[in-house]
């Protein structure tokens, strides 16, 4: 499975973990120490945030996808031995895609490493489904990619870190979640291998997923919902108020649609939302039913 992921992502080597949370938790502490610096997007996943907390490197945080602020932080960290830029490939609460092309340009300019957590992209983003680095045209320029086997690559559990061979070799020797935890169950590895084979053999599922995403996004906009713009299958329906998000989620469950309301501290105050995740397994009838139920709930809540 490690070899197959390496081939699929176009990297040099891969190491498996029991989860992507463990992959991120075992990365920064292993690679970075006091003389180093990590520059992290402010909307990064909790696992990146917690992983960075475990290391002793200098920490800088830049405004999300703000390249001017990222450059300013790289300059602030000029005296660091090594600098690493850390970002989600796709931000899980927004469905927005990192500006990896510009990030890689800045990394080249300031001799920094680039790390992405691509859990919400590998398997369907990019021409061949390889993820954000393929989607943004920077394959071969990202030093470290972490990801999960719990979404498009099998839907069960497990995670990985993939990238430059010297980095992966070092993780095998020093990364605590790898050394002191269990490996994947064989059935999970087999399912993930099969998932990669399916993704590699045909683009049909990716095309269906993107068609479903367009249908749902366009339909919800016509119904008057405020959704964050984009092309990703994560579709945030912005409601603002935490109680409203909870009420909407409860109404939808009563109508046979399971969605979750997110609010502070998971998202910033005043930006409560329902996060919908579209699948290639959804039929047009499924999507139309979901939109009809959203319209009913919207009317019942007086929106």
Residue ranges and their predicted role:
Residues 2-26:
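Short loop-beta-helix segment that forms the pyridoxal 5′-phosphate
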Residues 27-46:
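Conserved PLP-anchoring active-site segment centered on the Schiff-base-forming lysine
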Residues 207-216, 221-256, 266, 270-271, ...:
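Conserved PLP-binding catalytic core of the aspartate aminotransferase-like
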Residues 110-113, 120, 125-231, 244:
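Active-site C-terminal subdomain of aminotransferase-like
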Residues 60, 64-116:
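Active-site phosphate-binding strand-loop segment of PLP-dependent enzymes
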Residues 7, 254-257, 266-303:
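PLP-dependent enzyme catalytic core of the Aspartate aminotransferase-like
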Residues 32, 63-67, 79, 83-89, ...:
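Pyridoxal 5′-phosphate
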């Amino acid at each position: 499975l490690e070899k197959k992921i390496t081939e699929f992502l176009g990297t040099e080597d891969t190491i498996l973990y029991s989860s992507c949370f463990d992959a991120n938790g075992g990365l920064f502490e292993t690679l970075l120490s006091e003389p180093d610096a990590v520059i992290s997007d402010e909307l990064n996943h909790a696992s990146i945030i917690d992983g960075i907390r475990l290391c002793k490197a200098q920490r800088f945080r830049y405004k999300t996808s703000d390249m001017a602020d990222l450059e300013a932080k790289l300059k602030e960290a000029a005296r660091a031995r090594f600098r690493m830029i850390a970002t989600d490939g796709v931000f899980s609460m927004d469905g927005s895609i990192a500006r990896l092309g510009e990030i890689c340009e800045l990394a080249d300019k300031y001799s920094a490493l680039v790390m992405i957590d691509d859990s919400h992209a590998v398997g369907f983003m990019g021409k061949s489904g390889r993820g954000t680095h393929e989607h943004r045209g920077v394959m071969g320029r990202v030093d470290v990619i972490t990801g999960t086997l719990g979404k498009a690559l099998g839907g069960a559990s497990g995670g990985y870190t993939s990238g430059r061979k010297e980095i992966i070799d070092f993780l095998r020797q020093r990364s605590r979640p790898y050394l002191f935890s269990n490996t994947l169950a064989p059935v999970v590895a087999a399912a993930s291998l099969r998932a990669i084979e399916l993704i590699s053999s045909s683009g049909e599922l990716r095309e269906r997923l993107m068609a479903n995403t367009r249908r749902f996004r366009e339909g919800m906009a016509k119904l008057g919902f405020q959704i964050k713009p984009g092309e990703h299958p994560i579709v945030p329906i912005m409601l603002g108020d935490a109680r409203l998000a909870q009420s909407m989620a409860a109404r939808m469950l009563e109508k046979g649609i399971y969605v979750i309301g997110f609010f502070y501290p998971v998202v910033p105050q005043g930006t409560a939302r329902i996060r919908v995740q579209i699948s290639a397994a959804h039929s047009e009838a499924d999507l139309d039913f979901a939109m009809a139920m959203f319209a009913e709930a919207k009317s019942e809540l007086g929106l």
